[in-house]
């Protein structure tokens, strides 16, 4: 059984591209009003234009999710203009081109953790009390395959941030399920988004075509959101059928240094 999302309000971070933008499109088609957050204004404006072409309703709330005070202000803006936030999609994230222990500095590590993990927490912190007061709310944390399976390709900082995000999801359900709040850890394997452009080893077009596509994740997010309130999808682990982590290859399982 699916519920109607018509008239609900969603806050989507990382909404300027990739999974975040695909989530916006899928939810707007279901009648959801959306608040769009991200660091880059121009991509957010493009997403807003796409919403308007669908006759949807949305507003811009640009923010660096690592800035906790700015995040609270963004949430307040969305509530003031669109109503209480029913759905939070934490899709903001990044990775490093130089991601090995031998290449990273302390600042590199902290940047990944501050955006991927602390940024998600900041957004949760901004909505959780209001969801608790209403006895209802859905949080979707876009984690990663690397948040469930250790990955050489993802690197240690990204992997640590996503493992922690998956754990944060579980503890929200442990503490807040009794308050009507549901949290899902969405853990996709490789998705053909612009984050691939930061890979140390370039990804060929033929490989990108075999990967999950952003729209696959957008529709999955809509599916999660359309579950009735008594259903909590704690975790959704999703991969392409041609899963490169199962196939092997020098970028996934490198040999010893030459």
Over which residues does each language-model region extend?
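Active-site helix of classical SDR
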Residues: 124, 161
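Conserved glycine-rich cofactor-binding loop
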Residues: 9, 16-18
